[in-house]
Amino acid sequence: MIALIQRVTRASVTVEDEVTGEIGPGLLVLLGVEKEDDEQKANRLCERVLGYRIFSDADGKMNLNVQQAGGSVLVVSQFTLAADTERGMRPSFSGGAAPDRAQALYEYFVGRCRQQAINTQTGRFAADMQVELVNDGPVTFWLQV
């Protein structure tokens, strides 16, 4: 399971001209689900995403996690993160989970974020989405479990 996380001052996702999720300061999480992923990996990745200390403390050091910083989370499914790009000029998506399994794990991950009392907004699984964000820093990390 892969999360590309970006520290943002604001972010939103729109599907068919409808805003489905919008946050102020916090994390934009682009989530990719791979074939071998399960709830245990989703738990571990959620723990890492929410615990990752990439927000500035009073001294300006990256020392706070999203909850300590009072931030929110916007989770957007992105199957392209599971692409194999090692050969050729076209990515292969054979490493991605089947759509039904990927959706179940995506929803599980979102639920785990919400259980941690984090304001969690979402896109719409498998939809054509437009994501807008202001990357703060820029600060972007690739987390994989």
Swiss-Prot record:
Keyword Membrane: no
Entry keywords, A to Z: Cytoplasm, Hydrolase, RNA-binding, tRNA-binding
EC numbers, comma separated: 3.1.1.96
Gly-cisPro motif, important for rejection of L-amino acids (motif): residue ranges: 137-138
Classification via CDD domains: Dtyr_deacylase (cd00563)
Entry's family note: Belongs to the DTD family.
Record protein name field: D-aminoacyl-tRNA deacylase
Biological source species: Salmonella arizonae (strain ATCC BAA-731 / CDC346-86 / RSK2980)
Organism lineage: Bacteria, Pseudomonadati, Pseudomonadota, Gammaproteobacteria, Enterobacterales
Protein's gene: dtd
